Swiss-Prot record:
InterPro entries: Aquaporin-like (IPR023271), Aquaporin_transptr (IPR034294), MIP (IPR000425), MIP_CS (IPR022357). GO terms for cellular component: membrane; vacuolar membrane. Aquaporins contain two tandem repeats each containing three membrane-spanning domains and a pore-forming loop with the signature motif Asn-Pro-Ala (NPA). This is Probable aquaporin TIP4-2. Pfam families: MIP. The keyword Transmembrane helix applies. Expressed in roots, leaves and anthers. A motif (NPA 2) lies at residues 201-203. Keywords: Membrane, Repeat, Transmembrane, Transmembrane helix, Transport, Vacuole.
Length: 256
């Protein structure tokens, strides 16, 4: 089987860091990830308080709705700027697919982590030091189980991105990919909220951990997504992508 376009790595070069398009894209990832984490964490705090006696299920459902909306809106808003990744797992998975160079992906990840950290630190200031929700394993869920769960959730996330955004033969109308991705994030949050919190995003987990100093099992939220995401990209390419129908190449996410 020939090496397919979606499974090619491109190293890139340091000069990319000074290209105007790259600078705009990195700034976009910082800004949109900041907004994503700020709204996401704030909504989780609010959902927990509002649920009150309704219990954990109501809080998870409310948080899932908020996550779905904020991902759909901000991924759409940032799509033409940087691709609207908002997530190191998405960025590194797309690097595996050759849609972004490894050098630029490193800049994206740094910007995403910075945006997440700033969002959580600001939120702690605005809430008077109120407890910041941190992704953690539920009782009875071990680290290996947590990694597996996060890998599966992130696998589905990247599979949807491949099918609705990257594949030129996609059935989804143009521009609806980020919306469908947001809906999937909401569904995964409901499914995995009571297990691992269904992060699917190392940056989303990093900011709260940094702001609170709670690092227990934090590595789970890196290993799981970074295993599941790239696997989905490779699997989609090998199993479902028809290179001849696609004209021999995928349409890369916009980088400028």
């Amino acid at each position: 089987m020939p090496l397919l376009p979606m499974t090619k790595l491109e190293l890139g070069h340091r000069g990319e860091a000074w290209e105007p398009g790259c600078l705009r894209a990195v700034a976009g990832e910082l800004l949109f990830t900041f907004l994503f984490v700020f709204i996401g964490v704030a909504s989780t705090i609010t959902a927990g308080k509002a649920a009150g006696g309704a219990g954990e299920a109501a809080a998870v459902t409310a948080a899932a709705m908020a996550q779905a909306l904020v991902v759909a809106v901000l991924a759409t808003a940032g799509f033409h700027v940087s691709g609207g990744h908002l997530n190191p797992a998405v960025t590194l998975s797309l690097a595996v697919g050759g849609h972004i160079t490894l050098f630029r992906s490193a800049l994206y990840v740094a910007a995403q982590l910075a945006g997440s950290s700033l969002a959580c630190l600001l939120l702690r200031c605005l809430t008077g030091g109120a407890a910041t929700p941190v992704h953690a394993l539920a009782d009875g869920v071990g680290p290996v189980q947590g990694v597996a769960a996060e890998a599966v959730f992130t696998f589905t996330l990247l599979l949807v991105i491949c099918a609705t955004i990257l594949d030129p033969r996609r059935a989804a109308p143009p521009g609806t990919g980020p919306l469908l991705t947001g809906l999937l994030v909401g569904a995964n949050t409901v499914a995995g909220g009571a297990l691992t919190g269904a992060s699917m995003n190392p940056a989303r987990s990093f900011g709260p951990a940094l702001a609170t100093g709670e690092w227990a099992h934090h590595w789970v939220y890196w290993v799981g997504p970074l295993a599941g995401g790239p696997l989905a990209v490779v699997a989609y390419e090998l199993l479902f992508m028809d290179v001849e129908d696609a004209g021999g190449a995928h349409q890369p996410l916009p980088q400028e």
